[in-house]
Regions:
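Internal intein/HINT superfamily modules and their associated LAGLIDADG
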Residues: 1-239
């Protein structure tokens, strides 16, 4: 396999905002691919990121930071509802980068065993969490009519909420850090299979979460950032 030209020791030490962000994103939505050897064993060889085409900025930003110069690959499939889903992906071939990521806890087949990292400095944890949120977190707003027996007319229930998915061990680390910064976070709940989740939505917590993620930040997924701003404005919330 041809070796790619890139900053191979980029993840050797997590010592700035962007490195912490990318470690978080890769833990959520990246993968490490093994290369089989002639003796039947395998070694970690390639880092891969694949995202929806609408989030291609992630690919461009990652390639820029690790100084990777290669073509982005595009693919598509049809969902069970008949909708065409378009993707883009990039791979970075470097055993050194793979092994550094594994040392920080970003392992192969991490969906069942992922733990909150101990190698990210305290002052960079929020950037790490933002990266993970951009990869495997969500923010949404919805409205529905709610009927109550003690009221003549139904009221509108407004839900502005956010959530993370992952292993229960990892999410306990996220929950602990968010609560240490004044947010009210729900308990880690078991989801489908090995996936757990945490969810929260008190208005003061959503405002604190927004500032925790984005204050003085230079890298983030614009789509999720814009969802916060659009919802704050729609609800006339001061933030």
């Amino acid at each position: 396999m041809r070796k790619d030209s890139l900053i191979e020791d980029y993840f050797e030490v997590i010592d700035n905002e962007h490195k912490a962000y990318w470690l978080g994103f890769l833990m959520a939505d990246g993968c490490i691919l093994d290369m089989p050897l002639s003796n039947g064993t395998k070694i970690p060889r390639t880092v891969q990121i694949m995202v929806s085409l609408c989030d291609i900025e992630i690919i461009h930003n990652f390639m820029h930071d690790i100084e990777l110069d290669k073509n982005i690959r595009y693919d598509s499939r049809v969902s069970i509802h008949g909708e065409k889903l378009e993707y883009c992906k990039v791979t970075a071939g470097s055993s050194k980068m793979c092994n550094d990521l594994i040392r920080h806890g970003c392992t192969q087949r991490k969906s069942k065993i992922l733990k909150f990292p101990v190698t990210v400095p305290d002052n960079l944890i929020r950037h790490f969490i933002r990266g993970y949120f951009d990869g495997d977190g969500s923010v949404w707003y919805c409205e529905r009519l709610q009927e109550r027996k003690d009221r003549k007319n139904p009221s509108i229930q407004r839900n502005f909420r956010s959530a993370f998915q992952g292993t229960s061990d990892f999410l306990e680390g996220v929950k602990s850090n968010l609560e240490a910064n004044g947010m009210t976070i729900g308990n880690v709940r078991k989801g489908h299979g090995d996936v757990s989740c945490i969810e929260f939505g008190a208005r003061d917590t959503m405002i604190k979460f927004y500032h925790y993620l984005y204050d003085d930040s230079t890298i983030f997924l614009k789509r999720k950032y814009n969802k916060f701003i659009e919802t704050f404005n729609y609800l006339n919330m001061a933030y």
